[in-house]
Amino acid sequence: MPSVHIIGGGVAGYALARHLVQQQYAGSIKISDAQGLPYDRPPLSKSLQVEPFAPVSWYQHHGVGLIQEDVQSLQLPQSADDWVVLATGTTPKALDVPGGHHALSLHSAADAARISDVLESGMFGQRVLVIGAGLVGAEFASTAKMSGAQVTLISSSDAPLAHVLGQELAEQLHADHANHGIATLTGAVTELGPNYALANGQRHDAELIVAAIGVEPETALAGHLGLEVDDGIVVDSQQRSLSNPQVLAIGDVAREENQPRAVHWEAAMEDAAQAAATIMGTAAPKRSVPWFWSDRHEMHVETVGDFSQAASTVTRLNRRGKIQTVFGLDAKGSLVSASMIDGGLMAKAVRRLIAKSATPSIEQLKDPLTGPRELGR
């Protein structure tokens, strides 16, 4: 019988299994993951919650095998009807300073449970130190503050995430932490202890230290299998490993040849759809304009497109004079990216405009009264 063995229970692995079920794949499907029941990762930093994609009954009903195991080696497919799909995701970067092991990470259900236990066991107002102010660090700092903690956020930059949000909005969002009672510090951590950190020559005491300084693709299994690895498992446009066409890679661990690695939820979903098409021998759905989101301090932040393609930016202010949207334009004036706060339907509208290489006027982009439907007309 044909088979698909998926290694990894994040969004990419689960989405692939669901696609295959919906398309009535005739073979066996199984998912192996050391953490057991597949669950969504973004809620970990947003709320410390573990949200399974589906109950165990869904897998039982559709004949999808669930194996709780840490796969460190396996046999490569021996038939063109059998597939191995690596959806192993990423692993947190270690804080490379003396005592760096004292910092907790926030990358798994076990991490979230451990951090929740510390927050819940302490007195109201306990001190929390967050190292790294990217997506995970900023979201967790907001979550910890809402739980009643005293939070200090250490960043190496005054504008974390400028490369994906645009410089202007990145600066505003980082500065906004102070408006919500979070102390921010720009600098480098040089040493950690069980309950303290040294940064910029000063000691910062804390009952909880969390490091969120980025992630790396989890390629240990791929390396063991002899697959080509270069900032992720290198794949073609059909998600096939360049080293073995019966091995696919999807999600954060995969990188299409000659392209940067995409590391967002939506990209993982699209990888899964492409992998299902490869396995089923059907036409793949068209890739959409990149999109991701983040939640902090009860604000919904969205980015569409790619700011690395922007030659210039245009900002739109709200009634209070704060930046609400940053639009990125290429050298020809075509819209290539945008980031926004509580943008509503604007994100969908901008995605459509980017896909069409639209060239809205500067006046339209700046005008807060120009809504999603009018933009680009």
Can you say where each PLM-predicted feature lies in the sequence?
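C-terminal catalytic lobe of FAD-dependent flavoproteins
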Residues: H204-E228, H300-R377
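Rossmann-like dinucleotide-binding cores of NAD(P)H-dependent redox enzymes
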Residues: R127, V136-T190, S288-W293
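FAD-site-proximal beta/loop scaffold in flavoenzymes
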Residues: H101-F124, N195-A197, R203-A268
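Mid-to-C-terminal Rossmann-like scaffold of FAD/NAD(P)H-dependent oxidoreductases
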Residues: P2, V253-L345
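FAD-binding core/adjacent interface of flavoenzyme oxidoreductases
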Residues: M1-H5, K30, P52-R127, A197-R203, ...
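Residue-level detector of alpha-helix initiation sites
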Residues: G10-V11, T90-P92, A110, L135, ...
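Beta1-alpha1 glycine-rich phosphate/pyrophosphate-binding loop at the start
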Residues: P2-G65, A141-V164, A349
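Conserved acidic residues
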Residues: G10, D70-Q75, G134, A188-V189
